[in-house]
């Protein structure tokens, strides 16, 4: 067995752009022969995957699965909506979802490690960066889910609710994007931050501090209602809030999870003219 030195790993990294562990593994399998390691990495798609790793993957799909009192929601990213509809990409996402559900896996790093070889092979085949971004689960008395075009997904847990009500509530969460279940669930940190913003706005109007503070109290009540599920007007019947609807039905919502494809990912704006100019210089 050849000695796999740090210098050898460094050289392979520089030549392929692959990660340190991938390079070490390739060198070990090639018994220290760097040329053979490169050839094997090319065959496996590892080099192509490494080159694609820096590409922003902000498109993709949301997948959900519920059985009984357990549900899972997953986001898998790619770079374009075209690939998001690809049968191979969809099959990969379904396979990851099945594994997450079967193993009740909520640590995305565990899923990434489990599916890294398949991900690398798919990147080589499709030609886009692919990323298992996040996974979460819910348990509860009554679970519901809703998918809006595979780009927005919701899992929701309720008590004393029928299937139709839970579906409607999941649709509401998808459309109205609440951040909390109830106004009292809004964290102290979020409340303090918004209070200061509203106080600054009120003070800028020239009002005395005492009056400004009273104005802000009213605004804060409105704010906590707007960001909480039960405080929002129900999308199907805006004449009542979700809280009023739940009271009528003697039901309650315990928790929900909402995923939207690419949310929070900064997608670089492409200057097409500059890109063409750069490509012409390379050719």
Curated annotation (Swiss-Prot):
The lineage of its organism: Bacteria, Pseudomonadati, Pseudomonadota, Gammaproteobacteria, Enterobacterales. Residues 80-83 are annotated as: Involved in Mg(2+) ion dislocation from EF-Tu. The keyword Lyase does not apply. Gene3D superfamilies: 1.10.286.20, DNA helicase RuvA subunit, C-terminal domain, Elongation factor Ts, dimerisation domain. SUPFAM superfamilies: Elongation factor Ts (EF-Ts), dimerisation domain, UBA-like. Pfam families: EF_TS. Keywords: Cytoplasm, Elongation factor, Protein biosynthesis. GO terms for molecular function: translation elongation factor activity. The gene is tsf. Belongs to the EF-Ts family. HAMAP family: EF_Ts (MF_00050). Associates with the EF-Tu.GDP complex and induces the exchange of GDP to GTP. It remains bound to the aminoacyl-tRNA.EF-Tu.GTP complex up to the GTP hydrolysis stage on the ribosome. Its main location: cytoplasm. It comes from Erwinia tasmaniensis (strain DSM 17950 / CFBP 7177 / CIP 109463 / NCPPB 4357 / Et1/99). This is Elongation factor Ts.
């Amino acid at each position: 067995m050849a000695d796999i030195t740090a210098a050898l790993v460094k050289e392979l990294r520089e030549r392929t752009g692959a990660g340190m562990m991938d390079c070490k593994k390739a060198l070990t399998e090639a018994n220290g022969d760097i040329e053979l390691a490169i050839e094997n990495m090319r065959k496996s798609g590892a080099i192509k995957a490494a080159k694609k790793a820096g590409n922003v993957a902000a498109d993709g799909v949301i997948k959900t699965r519920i059985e009984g009192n357990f549900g899972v929601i997953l986001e898998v990213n790619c770079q374009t909506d075209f690939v998001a509809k690809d049968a191979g990409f969809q099959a990969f996402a379904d396979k990851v979802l099945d594994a997450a559900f079967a193993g009740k896996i909520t640590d995305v790093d565990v899923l990434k490690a489990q599916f890294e070889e398949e991900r690398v092979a798919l990147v080589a085949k499709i030609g886009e960066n692919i990323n298992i971004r996040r996974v979460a689960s819910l348990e509860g008395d009554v679970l519901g889910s809703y998918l809006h075009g595979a780009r927005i997904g919701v899992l929701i847990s309720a008590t004393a609710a029928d299937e139709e009500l839970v579906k409607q509530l999941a649709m509401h969460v998808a459309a109205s994007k609440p951040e909390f279940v109830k106004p009292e669930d809004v964290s102290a940190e979020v409340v303090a931050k918004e209070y200061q913003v509203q106080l600054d706005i009120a003070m800028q109007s020239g009002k005395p501090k005492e009056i400004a503070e009273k104005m802000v109290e009213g605004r804060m009540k409105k704010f906590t209602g707007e960001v909480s599920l039960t405080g929002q007007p129900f999308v199907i019947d805006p004449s009542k809030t979700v809280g009023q609807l739940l009271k009528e039905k003697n039901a309650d919502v315990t928790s929900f999870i909402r995923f939207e494809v690419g949310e929070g990912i900064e997608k670089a704006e492409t200057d097409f003219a500059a890109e063409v100019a750069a490509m012409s210089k390379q050719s």
